[in-house]
Amino acid sequence: RDGALHNTTTGRRISAVVPMHTFGHPMQIEALIDVAKEFNLVVVEDAAESIGSYVGSTHTGTFGRCSSLSFNGNKTITTGGGGAILTNDAELAQRIRHLATTAKMPHDYEYIHDAVAFNYRMPNINAALGCAQLSRLDDFLSAKRVLARKYAEGFSSARSMQFVAEPHGTTSNYWLNTIRLNKPDLSLRDELLVAARASGYMCRPAWNLLHTLPMHESAPRAKLPVAQNLWQSLINIPSSARHYLGQK
């Protein structure tokens, strides 16, 4: 109503949508942007896993009003922790910097804060590590694609599962390689996980769905059959590509 979306249960206006480029694979962001424009929704991209991934020639994280990147220790590049926010909105960028610096107001000697905020600034030593990592990003991405290609070839003849490849028209960084069972089967998924770990291969399931976690049990929800099926079907497989650095 009034050109905006509202939650039919609570009546609250829905102001933003947060799409995620899961495992580094770009989602259908252009279609989502069109829907967001129709209903006056702000798009905040979760690009934590997708540095180096593209839709056509456009990098993920540059479609919405802002986006987040992760530089956690397990990501494609790392600063040891933390991340970055991308935006081309100068006013928003200044607001983010202010809140990430304890909302401290300029003053010769007083400590004056004009908002509830936290100290989220990245230490210089971590930023220096990040700059060094960025200089090798192309090498890391190439190695990731070599590994993904080998996985795709290896699973091409599998009958009960398939390798999850980048969507058509996109370039994925293949941050976390994944296989998908052809039919959702929690027992088979767990059997494969146990067998892989027993053989020395560190594999894991996809995350538990948020609406199934105890702290969200009272939150509004809808039926999510696609998410449920994926949870029962996906297995993340070893994704370190260090052995393929320098290969193409």
Language model: regions and residue ranges:
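Conserved active-site segment immediately N-terminal to the catalytic lysine
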Residues: A16, E45-T79, D108-D114, Q162
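Hydrophobic "anchor" residues on beta-strands that sit immediately upstream
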Residues: L41-V42
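Active-site PLP attachment segment
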Residues: T62-T101, N124
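PLP-dependent aminotransferase class I/II
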Residues: D2-R12, A16-M20, H25, I29-A31, ...
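Conserved phosphate-binding and hydrolysis motifs of nucleotide-dependent enzymes
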Residues: S57, G83, N119
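Glycine-rich, phosphate-binding/catalytic loops in enzymes
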Residues: D34-K37, T60-G61
